Amino acid sequence: MAPTTYAVPPRPASLHFLLESSTSKNGVPSLDLRWEPFQRHIESFLNAIDAYTQAARTEIVARATDHTAAVRDLKADKEEMERGIQLQRESEGEMLATLEAERHVVADLNASLSHLQSSLTKIKEKSSALDAELQSERKEVKAMQAEKERQTNVLNNMRERDTTELKQLEEALGWRVEGIKQDQLLMRFTLIDPEDPAREFSIIVDVSKQVYSVPNCDPPIPSLPDLVRQLNFDRDLFAFIKRVRIAFRALIPNPPNPSTKFDDLTGPSRSR
């Protein structure tokens, strides 16, 4: 606050001076206290105090309002932060539960992987053993195939030789046998007719039953029933064949004397 300016400039004051100057005309001393300037000064001072107080009150109210708002904002921020912390705690709990579940899953997967690796090792060992066994089997099969091929070649050579010998024997004997049906034998005879040595005389013998039968004979033999009865009696098929050949030869006028190797065959001996 600026100092108040008085109307009368200040003068050096002393008690003696004050007493002389305050002596009135009637001889009674009087003291001039200059009340009005002082009063104005006091009023100005009081007004300044009132203004300061009002400004202070206004400032206090404004600050209180700001403080209340700040406290309210801080409370809201605190509540929001607490909610965020709670959410973070819940999220952390869920995350920990998820991590625990994943840990169990990883443990199970590791156990399964270990089991699979152990199984794979066993399978590899078994596969190696099987490969070795397979190689051994292949060698044996190859050796067996080579032996079988050798035997097949031998059998083929023997078959070719037997076929040639059989053909030569059939031509020499004038007799050929082949199966036409189950348990039926077709017998062809040649070298019977001297005018036509290649002429065939044939007969079919059915041996499928206990009683033999002849379903076909070309050319027919008049004594065939007797020959069949004799066959079923003595069960000597070779003797039956010789008797049939003789019967075929008897069909030719003026049959020649036996001249084939078949006629010279004696056949197996049988006791009746």
UniProtKB/Swiss-Prot annotation:
CDD domains: RWD_Spc25 (cd23784). It is found in: Nucleus; Chromosome, Centromere, Kinetochore. Keywords: Cell cycle, Cell division, Centromere, Chromosome, Coiled coil, Kinetochore, Mitosis, Nucleus. The keyword Lipid biosynthesis does not apply. Residues 62-174 form a coiled coil. GO terms for cellular component: Ndc80 complex; nucleus. GO terms for biological process: cell division; chromosome segregation. Pfam families: Spindle_Spc25 (PF08234). InterPro entries: Spc25, Spc25_C. Its main location: nucleus. Acts as a component of the essential kinetochore-associated NDC80 complex, which is required for chromosome segregation and spindle checkpoint activity. Component of the NDC80 complex, which consists of at least NDC80, NUF2 and SPC25. Belongs to the SPC25 family. This is Probable kinetochore protein SPC25. It comes from Cryptococcus neoformans var. neoformans serotype D (strain JEC21 / ATCC MYA-565) (Filobasidiella neoformans).
